[in-house]
Amino acid sequence: FITMSKEKMAKSKGNILKISDFKKKYNGQVLRLALMSTHYSQPLDWNEKLMDDCQRTLDKWYNCYVPVNKKILIQDDDLNPLYDDLNTPGYIAVLHKLYDKAKEGKQEEKEIFITACKFIGLLGQSKEEWDNFKKQNLKLSENDILKKIDDRNKARDKKDYELADKIR
């Protein structure tokens, strides 16, 4: 079952959320990663922090994105968590390790990482498509963001670090 901030989801409690509502705010890949973050036989606590963590993870992973135009085999050792009762959290841990190798910059390591992600339906868009989705869903305009950056820099220049951190 799914809980909403540690409270069981129920129509009577009014804490039911529709996937269509989430898709307005989050990319489908964020939903996918959130759902796979807990083993299918365990309860899932659905909350804003989970979604934000998954969003940040995918943002980080997309920084390593390269198009893969050749067939790359995923090593059995990397797939072992999925062989073990479809342990998706274990496979996500493998993806984090592959990411650590990929971020060192070697093309081959990046291709292995991207292929392993695509195997479970992640990183299926180009970096440009991913960034465009995020821009479309920003609550701040580009001018608002630039103004906040300017305000933050001014606060830092005045050594008002508390204000600068708040603006960030």
Feature annotation, model-predicted:
Residues 7-168:
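Structural preference for alpha-helix termini/caps and helix-kink/transition segments
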Residues 2-3:
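Basic helix-turn-helix/winged-helix DNA-binding cores
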